Amino acid sequence: MEFSTKALDWAKAGALAAKSDCLVIGLFESQTLAGAAKALDVATKGLVARLVKLGDFEGKRGTSLLLHEVAGVGAARVLLVGLGKEADFTDRAYAEAVRTALRALASTKAASVTWTLTEHTARDKDTAWAVLTAVTLIREASYRFIERHPELKSKRDKNGTGLRKLVLAVPAADAKTASVAAARGTAIANGMDLTRDLGNLPSNICTPTYLANTARQIAKDFKLKVEVLGRKQIEALKMGAFLAVTKGSVEPPAFIVLRYEGGPAKQAPVVLVGKGITFDTGGISLKPGEGMDEMKYDMCGAASVLGTLRAVAEMGLKQNVIAVVPTCENMPSGIATKPGDVVTSMSGQTIEILNTDAEGRLILCDALTYVERFKPAVVIDVATLTGACIIALGHINTGMYARSDALADALVAAGKQSLDTAWRMPLDEEYQEQLKSNFADMGNIGGRPAGSVTAACFLARFTEKYDWAHLDIAGTAWKSGAAKGATGRPVPLLTRFLMDRG
C-alpha cells in the first residue's frame, strides 16, 4: 500500500479535479462548511448543503454516505464521513472517523483514494499526528495474515482490502512535516505487521530458531548488529532461571541481542527486553487444554521488540536501541523442571519454582541481569506475563509498572499519543512479602491476590541498577474469537516513546 501527501488549496479552482477511485471528505455536525466539504459544495452547486438540509447526512460520528459520479469531481466516488461535533473532536473521534471511512471503502472496489480527513486535526494535535495516525490505522485495518502467508491455506481468501494508493491531503504549511509523518507511520505499520506475523504463525513454524533468524534478517535488511547465543553460551553465563524453563523441550533455546546504533557512540541505549516463549503448555504445571492453542502468542513480547527495532531502523531515529530476546518453549517431559525445584539465576539470587507456568518471569529475570552490561539509560521489558493483568485491565490498557515517575509519565504519554494506551500499576514494597520462600531467596509466584503486581515485583528484584519499566501485554497482544489474531501492540507505544526521546 502506497501513501503520499499533497498540499491542496480548496479555494483554488480544480482542487477536486484529481482522478481517483474515491474522494474521502469529513464533515462536522451542525457546522459551517469549510475546506474540502465547502469546495465540494461549491463544485456541486450546493449538493452538500442540500444533503444536510434534507437530513440525509448530518455529519454525526460513525456515519458515512457514499456518492457516485458526482459532477465537478474527478473521483469516481465521493465518501462523506461524519466527524461529530467539532468541539468534541478528540483523538479517539478522529480514529473513529478513519475506521468509519475504511468500513465504507471496504464495500467498494476503490483502489486509489484521495483522503482529506487529514485536514482535520484532533483537539491538541497537529497535522503530522493526523497523518501518522491515519497511516497506521489504515494499515492496521488492512492487515490480512493469510495474504502475507498464503502457504498456510490451500485456497486463497477473497476478503482482502482493495486499497493500493492513498493521497493524504494536508495544508501547504504542513507539507514537509506531513511527508515525514507518512514515512514514519509506514515504518510503524511495517513493524506492527512483523509483530503480528510472528504472533500469528503457528508454533511449529515460529520456533526460537525462527525468531533468531528473523532477527538476523532484520539486521541484514537494515545493517544492524545481531548476536544469537545458543544453549552452551547461555549455560556459560549461568542463566539458571532461563535454562530451567528450556529443559522440557527438544527445541533449542536462543538468546537474541539486536542492536540499532542511530545515536552518538557515547549515548546510553534504551534496551527493550521481550519475552519469547514460542509455545507455553505451562510445563509440569500444565494448562487446561481449552484455549491452549493461543499460547503460541506467548512470544508477542519478543515479537513486539523486534517489530519496534524494525520500525526504529526504518525511521532512522537518532537513538541507540537494543532488543534482547530470551526465547524457548515451555514443555512438560521426563526431564522438565518440577514445582518445588530451586534454581540459581544469573544474578546469583535463588528462586523456588512453585509453579512452572510462571515461566515468563524466569526467562526475563536473567535477561534483565544480562542487560546491565550495556549501562542502559532505560530498560523496558515487554511480556504476555499474567492472566491477572487481563482480570485487572481487560483488553484496553496495557499494564505498566515503572520504578520512576518520569519514566511512567513518558510511557503513559506515549500511549495516549499513539492510541496504544497503558495504565500505571503499583509496585509498593509491601507486595514483595508475597514472594517469600522458606527454601530460596524468593518464590516465582505470590499467590492469587495481585498476581500481575507480584509478577512485576519479582522482576523488580533484578532491575535495581537502572531505570526500568515493565509492560504486561497479556490483555492487549492478541484478540480471541472471530477476530482472533495478534494486534501488533505495543509497537505504536514503544516507537512513540522513542520518537519523543529525540
Swiss-Prot record:
Annotated residues that bind Mn(2+) 2 are located at K275, D280, D298, E359
The active site consists of K287, R361
Its recorded name reads: Probable cytosol aminopeptidase
Question: Keywords of this protein's UniProt record, alphabetized?
Answer: Aminopeptidase, Cytoplasm, Hydrolase, Manganese, Metal-binding, Protease
GO CC, sorted alphabetically, is: cytoplasm
| HAMAP family to which the protein is assigned, alphabetical | Cytosol_peptidase_M17
Q: Which residues are involved in binding Mn(2+) 1? A: D280, D357, E359
Q: Name one GO molecular function term.
A: manganese ion binding
The protein's job, in short, is: Presumably involved in the processing and regular turnover of intracellular proteins. Catalyzes the removal of unsubstituted N-terminal amino acids from various peptides.
The UniProt similarity line reads: Belongs to the peptidase M17 family.
According to its UniProt record, the EC number is 3.4.11.1, 3.4.11.10
**Entry cofactor note text?**
Binds 2 manganese ions per subunit.
Q: Which reaction does it catalyse?
A: Release of an N-terminal amino acid, Xaa-|-Yaa-, in which Xaa is preferably Leu, but may be other amino acids including Pro although not Arg or Lys, and Yaa may be Pro. Amino acid amides and methyl esters are also readily hydrolyzed, but rates on arylamides are exceedingly low; Release of an N-terminal amino acid, preferentially leucine, but not glutamic or aspartic acids
Give the location in the cell: Cytoplasm
Q: Which cofactor does it need?
A: Mn(2+)
- What is the top EC class of this enzyme, as a single word? hydrolase
Kindly give the Gene3D superfamilies that the UniProt entry links to this protein.
Answer: Leucine Aminopeptidase, subunit E, domain 1, Zn peptidases
| Source organism per UniProt | Ralstonia pickettii (strain 12J)
One annotated GO biological process: proteolysis
Q: State the encoding gene.
A: pepA
* Matching Pfam families: Peptidase_M17, Peptidase_M17_N
